[in-house]
Amino acid sequence: MKTFDYSLVKDPQYFKDGRMDAHSDHTYYRDGEEAKEKETSFRYDFNGIWKFHYARNYGSAIPEFEKTEYCCKDWDDIRVPAHIQMEGYDVPQYANVQYPWEGHEDIHPGEIPEHFNPVASYVKYFEVPEEMQGKRLFISFQGAESGIALWLNGHFVGYSEDSFTPSEFELTEYVKEGENKLAAQVFKWTASSWCEDQDFFRFSGIYRDVYLYTVPEVHVYDLQIRAIPDETLSAAALEIRTNTWGKGEVKITLSKDGETVIEDKKALDGEEIYSWKVEDPVLWSAEDPQLYDLTMEIYNESGELQEVIPQKVGFRRFEMKDGIMTLNGKRIVFKGVNRHEFSSVSGRHVSEEELRKDLKIMKQNNINAIRTCHYPDASLIYQLCDEYGIYMIDETNLESHGSWDIAEFTKDYTYVVPHDKPEWLDMMLDRANSMYQRDKNHAAILIWSCGNESFGGKDIFEMSQFFHKADPTRLVHYEGVCHDRRYNDTSDMESQMYPSVEAIKEFLAKDDSKPFVCCEYTHAMGNSCGAMHKYTDLTDTEPKYQGGFIWDYIDQSIYKKDRYGKEFQAYGGDFGERPTDYNFSGNGIAYGGNRDASPKMQEVKFNYQNITAEVSADSVKVINKNLFVNTDIFDCKVTVAKDGKVIRKASLATAVAPLSEEVYALPLAKEEKPGEYAVTVSFHLKEDKVWAEAGHEVAFGQYIYKVEAPKKACPEGVEVIRSTHNIGVRGAHFEVLFSVLNGGLASYKYAGKEMIEAIPKPNFWRAPTDNDCGNLMGMRYGQWKIASMYLSHKDFRKGPYGPGNVPEVEVNEKTVKVTYTYLMPTTPTSECRLSYEVFGDGRVKTTLTYDPVKELGDMPEFGVIFKFNADYDRVEWYGLGETETYSDRKKGAKLGIYANKVADNMARYMVPQECGAKEEVRWAKVTDRKGRGMLFEMDEHNGPMMFSALPYTPHEMENAMHPYELPEVHYTVVRVAKDQMGVGGDDSWGARTHEEYLLKTDKKMEFSFVFKGL
């Protein structure tokens, strides 16, 4: 009798034993009615409650638990599918490059930890369902991480590795009447774990669906469908290859929108290939995901119906032409994102509801491609991408970044796996084959990927050769060849991670033999994605650059409760696990938890839009970047807003052919009355889609112009009251008090109510973003934080009791101007000046000036910070919106009037950091529920300003590693600034904000704005 030998788990050549051959993911039904209901009686769901035992290592696992005489019915219960770490056993561990056992056990590639390597033992007692009795019986584990051994009634059935493709076994030989005992043992780390070092949380267990299944007398075990148009695209070949158990006949029907295109019958016997010609096929693309319905009815030799196989078919031609990747003859641009399969509730077991939400948000924001980083996803996503229209790079389960990193440190590349090692080759080919066989019939998949960040070598080259041979209708991708050029033909395209735009240009200038893609770019960690437009603009000017995939879609965070029982989004290290890479798991353009789009998505949507509207005061140039659809399938709307309020609307009929442009006169005349006007041209869905309702905006452009008005002078004057310690200024409804002693604006009363909670101060700091932390901004700019916190009107060089700088007071005919000079504790010492000019109507023009000190360089921000009572919790602004904007991330924003709560401006980044800023603000106000508060206006000479209203200061945010660590809210903190530096985002481990988005400190800096009570 065959037995299981645990010692083989650390052998890279032992990765399958008794496992069924991989096959396509088609579903088969007993008849047409079942197919219509999508409920197959050939399957029996094994999801649910299993008996469970947890052990820290194999030595602690219960021996011979699989035997029928060993009763496991008093074991713990566990849900399946689920990671055991999400069910209270072991803990989730997040690690990026480093292997999770590093520093705990000294092992080498192929070896496995012995001291701590959790073993999950599962038992399921069951009786074979009546309709399955007497038939061949199989079991499918759609995903078990990372190795699974299986027994039935004490008999060893088999063993399988590859955490991300199905492991299926035949049980027929060992099944019996009455109660059966199915036992499985899942090992967290096996030899193959050296090739599963992806940047994610480390889990284990049976985490995807499990089901029993039977097959009819005649059964199509594997199905390959190819629907490829010829070069003219006027006809296509439909080729179907079947691998059948038993003999019989198949009736094949291909239809489109209810009309039959093909109806035919063919004999079935073993492996068969059938082909038909389809005239004028309707082609599939992400822009217009047209699918045909294929139905295969399988009959035995007696003419009895055995099974019905429904399958969606997309006709499309993807190929390399003259060194350019083309889809249906057109140069394709990937407007993509990397997507880890992740849920804050259940780890890598993602529900259909969560998945559909992801895909809808992607489509709504013009994302047209997914890279399944860095493993095959559960099957449903491929079906939905076919339906929704999303291109896919399907990636093999391979990443050995840790071994490569060790080799980089030691310069000993023999440490790398799989590299050129023959003992790893079969495992690599098996993983490639398992993915290919399961997913091969999905139109959405354009490219097979050999894996991620595993250096290079012969083994990966052989994987690419397998894909090329198995599937000449798709291309093959692998980024790692850029680090090891020995096997440069591994990848059909040049793929790199996080190169600058200049680096891409330089590379293509030297070598344009292949098209170039960024398999990862614009690292979206925290407040990021600055200057993303430079990459997307490059796709318009450099034909060989064909787009990229943002890193990545969703924050990998897990619901956890703090010590007071309040849920928060936990990241690496929050479960007590070490080693870890902490919050590096949070790189999404969507939040963990509820999966909502983060503020970064606004910029992604604009940069990825397929229609460009270049608007002027009286016309619009419409550039249609779509490859296949005319702009006439969208409603085009034109609005004119005066000072933020829409005053006119119109529709515009457009009919711009794909990859063409047209200029249209606007249906609304240019305005002549004084004011600022925003002309917006936008495109919207005419009809409902599976991913959005009619009316959803897919693209826009905006043009701003002004009609000047004569300036109005303030007729009222002010009364000035001077004393030793204070300078008072009084008007009709307000009173201002400037403190000589405390060095600043101590009071601003409006309508009898004190408005400010603390003296406003110059501010040069922001709470560091994740990108700032990665490029050591705190070390480089730290003096500006100290300057912001400890500047003083007193000269610290004269001791703590030295005299303060007396403010300068300038009394004019109707105004008074008070100016403070602040010394800043920088090296060398520097100073700034803050002046307040008070007008008779309560307006206070505030001006901050700074004469740059060369040694100090640029600063994060240049503005003034205010504290108000937290009752002022409402914000309204006329500027860019609706989400936060920054100097290098504002192209996707529209000028308008927006409103929200102060708390809403705290973006839900996993680590508190700079957020909520508003660019190009003309005016903004913070008010209480009665409408009382403070109005801030730009100064006409300075132009629009940056505005921020948050519940916390930058220093409070910087001190918190989680949102729950932030203090109770006591204030509304307003920052008004000339600007702040951009957020950057080329990467999060050193790349700095681009030069043009830094604050210039090469000449005198000055910033003015006005505030007034409401």
Task: Enumerate the predicted regions with their spans.
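Beta-strand/loop-rich accessory regions of lumenal/periplasmic or secreted enzymes
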Residues: 85-86, 93-95, 143, 188, ...
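Intrinsically disordered, low-complexity Pro/Gly/Ser/Thr-rich segments with frequent PxxP/GP/PP motifs
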Residues: 265-279, 644-674
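Accessory beta-strand-rich segments of carbohydrate-active enzymes
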Residues: 2-4, 8-10, 14-16, 20, ...
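Accessory carbohydrate-binding/adhesion or oligomerization-edge regions at the termini
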Residues: 1-101, 185, 257, 536, ...
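An acidic-aromatic loop/edge-strand motif
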Residues: 83-86, 91-112, 161-163, 171-236, ...
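Extended acidic/polar, glycine-enriched regions
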Residues: 175-179, 241-319, 677-716
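Catalytic cores of secreted or luminal carbohydrate-active enzymes
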Residues: 196-220, 565-621, 625-635, 641-645, ...
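Extended substrate-binding grooves/exosites of carbohydrate-active enzymes
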Residues: 1-38, 155, 194, 305-619, ...
